[in-house]
Protein backbone atom coordinates (compact mmCIF):
# COMPACT_ATOMS: atom_id res chain seq x y z
CA UNK A 1 0.00 0.00 0.00
CA UNK A 2 1.29 3.46 -0.84
CA UNK A 3 0.03 6.63 0.80
CA UNK A 4 0.64 10.33 0.30
CA UNK A 5 -0.90 12.23 3.18
CA UNK A 6 -0.47 15.28 5.30
CA UNK A 7 0.08 13.75 8.68
CA UNK A 8 0.81 14.89 12.19
CA UNK A 9 3.14 12.65 14.16
CA UNK A 10 1.73 12.03 17.61
CA UNK A 11 4.25 9.72 19.16
CA UNK A 12 6.42 6.66 19.04
CA UNK A 13 6.66 3.89 21.57
CA UNK A 14 9.18 1.08 21.77
CA UNK A 15 7.77 -2.26 22.84
CA UNK A 16 10.00 -5.14 23.79
CA UNK A 17 8.94 -8.39 22.17
CA UNK A 18 10.20 -11.90 22.82
CA UNK A 19 12.17 -11.91 19.56
CA UNK A 20 13.29 -8.29 19.46
CA UNK A 21 11.80 -4.80 19.45
CA UNK A 22 8.66 -3.44 17.88
CA UNK A 23 8.08 0.29 17.42
CA UNK A 24 4.54 1.67 17.46
CA UNK A 25 4.39 4.95 15.51
CA UNK A 26 1.19 6.97 15.82
CA UNK A 27 0.03 9.45 13.17
CA UNK A 28 -2.99 11.73 12.88
CA UNK A 29 -4.39 12.18 9.37
CA UNK A 30 -7.80 12.85 7.83
CA UNK A 31 -9.35 13.24 11.26
CA UNK A 32 -8.19 9.80 12.39
CA UNK A 33 -5.30 8.63 14.53
CA UNK A 34 -3.66 5.45 13.34
CA UNK A 35 -0.70 3.40 14.46
CA UNK A 36 1.90 1.74 12.29
CA UNK A 37 4.06 -0.98 13.76
CA UNK A 38 7.67 -0.88 12.64
CA UNK A 39 9.57 -4.08 13.15
CA UNK A 40 13.10 -2.78 13.09
CA UNK A 41 14.97 0.42 13.82
CA UNK A 42 16.11 1.17 10.28
CA UNK A 43 17.24 4.35 8.53
CA UNK A 44 13.61 5.16 7.70
CA UNK A 45 12.70 5.12 11.36
CA UNK A 46 15.69 7.32 12.18
CA UNK A 47 14.26 9.93 9.79
CA UNK A 48 10.96 9.67 11.59
CA UNK A 49 12.56 10.05 15.01
CA UNK A 50 14.32 13.22 13.87
CA UNK A 51 11.03 14.93 13.04
CA UNK A 52 9.32 17.26 15.44
CA UNK A 53 6.21 15.49 16.69
CA UNK A 54 2.99 17.45 16.33
CA UNK A 55 4.20 19.20 13.17
CA UNK A 56 2.11 18.65 10.06
CA UNK A 57 3.92 17.65 6.91
CA UNK A 58 3.25 15.81 3.67
CA UNK A 59 4.69 12.33 3.66
CA UNK A 60 4.75 9.77 0.88
CA UNK A 61 5.29 6.33 2.26
CA UNK A 62 4.62 2.71 1.52
CA UNK A 63 3.54 0.16 4.07
CA UNK A 64 4.96 -3.27 3.39
CA UNK A 65 3.64 -6.25 5.35
CA UNK A 66 6.44 -7.90 7.29
CA UNK A 67 6.03 -10.67 9.82
CA UNK A 68 2.52 -9.68 10.99
CA UNK A 69 3.51 -6.02 11.28
CA UNK A 70 4.03 -3.08 8.96
CA UNK A 71 7.38 -1.72 7.91
CA UNK A 72 7.50 1.93 6.85
CA UNK A 73 9.29 2.67 3.61
CA UNK A 74 9.52 6.44 3.06
CA UNK A 75 9.55 7.71 -0.49
CA UNK A 76 9.82 11.35 0.52
CA UNK A 77 9.46 13.73 3.41
CA UNK A 78 8.24 17.15 2.34
Predicted regions, residues:
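Structural detector for short beta-strands of small beta-barrel domains
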Residues: 1-21
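Hydrophobic residues positioned within well-ordered beta-strands of beta-sheet architectures
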Residues: 5, 24-25, 57-59
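A mid-sequence interfacial segment
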Residues: 9-11, 38-43, 78
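Beta-strand elements of well-folded, non-transmembrane domains
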Residues: 11-14, 31, 63-65
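OB-fold (S1/OB) nucleic-acid-binding surfaces
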Residues: 17-40
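Short C-terminal domain-edge/linker segments immediately following a structured domain
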Residues: 35-43, 67-70
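Short nucleic-acid-contacting surface segments enriched for D/E, G, S/T with interspersed K/R
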Residues: 42-60
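OB-fold/S1-family single-stranded nucleic acid-binding modules
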Residues: 62-78
Amino acid sequence: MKFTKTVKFLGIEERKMKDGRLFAVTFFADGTAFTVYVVEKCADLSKLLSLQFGKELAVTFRLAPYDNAWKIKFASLA
